[in-house]
Regions:
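Local sequence-structure signature of Cys/Sec-based thiol-disulfide redox active-site neighborhoods
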Residues: 1-23, 27-32
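Thiol/selenol-based redox catalytic cores and closely related redox-interacting motifs
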Residues: 32-114
């Protein structure tokens, strides 16, 4: 079964969930804020998504970080993401072992079938 990693208040996550439901695709959701983001789960995600692609530099959370935190991203990214799950790009759709679709735009899930 597919897993959709979301933050419930994210509009793009809602669109992704709706697209999967409309296609009749079975999936479970995992709310990164409510359900928590452990170091183990983050490592699991980063096995399928490059760290540079996982950090959402367009988020309010990113903009609110100090310049020092942004500059130390190479060494502290994992710790920052665990502290601030909204730094992780989302939604993340886990479609297979170590295979993730990052973000969502209309039509992204068309190839998944139903």
């Amino acid at each position: 079964m597919l897993t959709l990693y979301i933050i419930d208040t994210c509009d793009t996550c809602r669109k992704a969930r709706k697209a999967l439901e409309e296609k009749g695709i079975a999936f479970k959701t995992y709310d990164l804020r409510k359900d928590g983001l452990s170091a183990g789960l983050l490592e699991h995600i980063l096995e399928g998504v490059a760290l540079v692609d996982a950090v959402n530099k367009r988020s309010k959370t990113w903009r609110d970080l100090s310049q020092e935190e942004k500059d130390s991203l190479d060494t502290s990214a994992r710790q920052l993401i665990i502290q601030h799950p909204t730094l992780l790009k989302r939604p993340l759709l886990e479609v297979g072992d170590k295979t993730f679709l990052v973000g969502y735009r209309d039509g992204d899930y068309d190839q998944l079938g139903g």
